[in-house]
Design a protein with these regions (language model features):
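Structural/interface elements that position substrates and couple domains in central-metabolism enzymes
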Residues: 1-440
Length: 440
């Protein structure tokens, strides 16, 4: 099938490459010339495992092209909307990119002769968006499906090609819904053939699936982080606690690792947008607990700063602090709402020096001007002469650090394990004063 993908950022680039890998003829459209040039050359504009190989293979095979012009979508049967919905000043989702994408594609629809033409929304949007857009799209004879994404950065290619479920939000009219479903089933034929569950529902429910999933994950993370504060006060171990409660099949163990909080371009934004939309619908009290989820998340950074002051002295005067990690999670170079960088920025005021290292995000960070911290080219150089190590992102290379070798580089042996990913006993045995999140 001929497909188009509107917006070639993180979501769109991965989706375009993955659909081409399934054998479709795909064109990606983006207004960013530099991004289009990179993608057209088979290069990824950001770090994501497996993506660059996928891009190069399908660009070389001629199945995947990129353009700045919306006219390039003409003739495609399915058009995926994959643009961002960033947080506005009010906390609500900024829908301007989605609206512009739809307005820009409208003149180029109804050029497909292969069958019904479908616009498939993948962007995370406030509930009610699809119904509004459907009125516009159906006026030109196309159909709208809401097909939310469930990608994890660092596993995005895997999650696209081998998803744990497929969701279609379809029109109310049974005949229209049947035609749209048939087209989407053809797009995902190879994925569905593996047994991936396909869930069919109305527009509003499909929109809520994505936003409520993110709200639930954020709640689970903040729950275990709140428990870590209780563990600190009571002398308990949050890692052992999480293991025990995670064995309850009603709870499960995933997302129960205490740390310095969640970040990225999804969870913080989405829980605030969810609250804002609920307020607009007159049910703001229903998800009001998400404000507390947000608050707990923010307080985790403050707790690390306080621990740093307890270890090095209240004013941190003369101290060098090393923050290991800049991306909000490992296997990514995404620094949006990064807890590690929040810490680096906050500590840059009182500390003499703050040095940051990240194996993927570091080179990008080094090019940024007016940052209050240094960026080290290697883990070793980041540790030289440090007084305190803070693990802010659980990259494998940080987990594999030899504490004895690290001690030979540091000036004093203090470590705050902001992701509870180090072997505490090994670090203590090497002479380090170790502090974890909810464990010692």
């Amino acid at each position: 099938m001929r497909l188009s993908v509107i917006g070639c950022g993180y979501l769109g680039a991965v989706h375009a490459a993955s659909m081409a890998e399934l054998g479709h003829d795909v064109v990606g459209v983006d207004i960013d010339t530099h991004k289009v040039d990179l993608l057209s050359d088979g290069r990824a504009p950001f770090f994501e495992p497996e993506l660059e190989e996928l891009l190069a293979r399908n660009v070389d095979a001629g199945r995947l092209t990129f353009s700045e012009n919306f006219s390039a979508i003409e003739g495609a049967q399915v058009h995926f909307i994959s643009v961002g919905t960033p947080q506005s000043e009010s906390g609500a989702a900024d829908m301007s990119y989605v609206n512009v994408a739809v307005d820009s594609m409208l003149p180029h629809l109804r050029r497909c002769t292969a069958g019904p033409e479908v616009v498939a929304g993948k962007s995370t949007v406030p509930v009610g968006t699809a119904s509004r857009l459907a009125q516009t799209i159906e006026r030109v004879g196309a159909l709208l499906v809401w097909n939310p994404e469930f990608l994890r950065e660092g596993f995005a290619v895997q999650d696209t090609l081998r998803p744990d479920r497929m969701v279609y939000g379809l029109p109310d009219d049974p005949g229209t819904a049947a035609r749209a479903k048939e087209v989407m089933d053809a797009v995902y034929e190879r994925i569905l053939a593996t047994g991936t569950p396909r869930l069919v529902m109305d527009y509003a429910t499909a929109e809520l699936v994505k936003i409520s999933a993110n709200a639930f994950l954020a709640t689970k993370i903040s729950f275990i982080n709140a428990m870590s504060q209780v563990c600190d006060a009571a002398g308990a171990n949050v890692t052992a606690l999480a293991e025990a409660i995670g064995m309850d099949e009603r709870i499960g163990s995933r997302f129960l690792r205490a740390g310095i909080g969640f970040g990225g371009g999804c969870l913080p934004k989405d829980i605030r947008a969810f609250q804002a939309r609920a307020d607009e619908l007159g049910v703001g009290d229903a998800p009001a607990f998400l404000a507390e989820v947000d608050r707990v998340n923010e307080t985790m950074r403050a707790g690390v700063v306080q621990t740093a002051k307890e270890l090095l002295g209240d004013n941190l005067t003369g101290a060098t602090v090393t923050v290991l990690g800049a991306a909000f999670k490992p296997d990514s170079d995404d620094m949006r709402n990064s807890p590690a960088l929040d810490l680096a920025t906050e500590l840059s005021g009182p500390a003499k020096r703050v040095v940051v290292h990240d194996p993927a995000a570091g080179p990008i960070l080094a090019k940024q001007e007016d940052r209050p911290y240094e960026v080290a080219p290697s883990t070793q150089s980041a540790l030289e002469g440090t007084d305190l190590i803070i693990v802010g992102t659980e990259w494998r290379e940080y987990q594999d650090l030899n504490p004895t070798q690290a001690a030979g580089l540091a000036r004093t042996r203090y470590v705050i394990d902001g992701r509870n990913c180090l072997d505490a006993q090994d670090w203590k045995a090497a002479g380090w004063t170790y502090r974890g999140i909810g464990r010692r």
